Regions:
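N-terminal, charged low-complexity regulatory/assembly segments
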Residues: 1-139
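Hydrophobic packing positions characteristic
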Residues: 87-202
Length: 205
């Protein structure tokens, strides 16, 4: 059973930078299920420069997936803030799936807790809905429509972000968008639903 345990710890060294740093600086590693030789090997691997490079390559691959599926969210936050949040997310959350959709949705959950930015919730809601609509499903499985509530006119906000421009001072008016996958791709039906409710302003994070 030590081989399976060794492989699990080796995988953690690649994905958990804090664990890798502790072992690389001589901290006692996990003892359960490992021989003394295996523990020494893991400590040597943790200190090897090549392992950190491998971890950076994996993080870069994950960042590329997030940029692909969340381009409007990246445009809203800006490339620097988006990359910084992606780095924090990768440090906290090990790779959960090879599927782009799963990674992007988990990153949205991270952003929802980490960031407070005007337009962010509705833009992420829209991109999450697009991911769900395009997600591969088994043959015959239903693909439910997606509902997104915007507090600003999406006809103004989304085109600005698509051009790489951040929306500013867009009038608040609630819209409800219903998206569904048709024969020619994703279609949206958008209706104004009256003024958006006023909220106390919160400091951006």
């Amino acid at each position: 059973m030590t081989q399976a345990r060794f492989q699990r710890v080796l995988g953690r060294l690649v994905t958990d930078r804090d664990f890798r740093a502790r072992l690389g600086h001589g901290a006692a590693g996990p003892r359960s299920g490992l021989s003394a030789i295996e523990r020494r090997r893991l400590m040597a691997i943790a200190a090897a420069p090549g392992l950190a490079l491998t971890a950076r390559l994996i993080d870069s691959f994950r960042l590329g997936k997030l940029i692909t599926l969340l381009p409007l969210t990246r445009a809203l936050l800006g490339p620097v803030r988006f990359a910084r949040e992606a780095e924090a997310y990768c440090a906290k959350v090990p790779p959960i799936s090879f599927y782009l959709a799963d990674e992007a949705l988990a990153f949205c959950d991270h952003l929802r807790a980490a960031c407070r930015r005007p337009y962010l919730a509705e833009v992420m809601g829209y991109e999450r809905a697009m991911i769900e609509l395009k997600r591969p499903r088994p043959d015959g499985a239903q693909r439910p429509s997606q509902r997104v509530v915007f507090e600003h006119d999406p006809g103004l906000v989304l085109p600005l972000l698509a051009r790489g421009e951040r929306p500013r001072a867009v009038p608040r008016r609630r819209h409800v968008a219903i998206g569904f996958l048709g024969a020619d791709g994703v279609d949206w039906r958008i209706e104004a639903a009256g003024p958006a409710p006023r909220r106390a302003s919160r400091q951006e994070r």
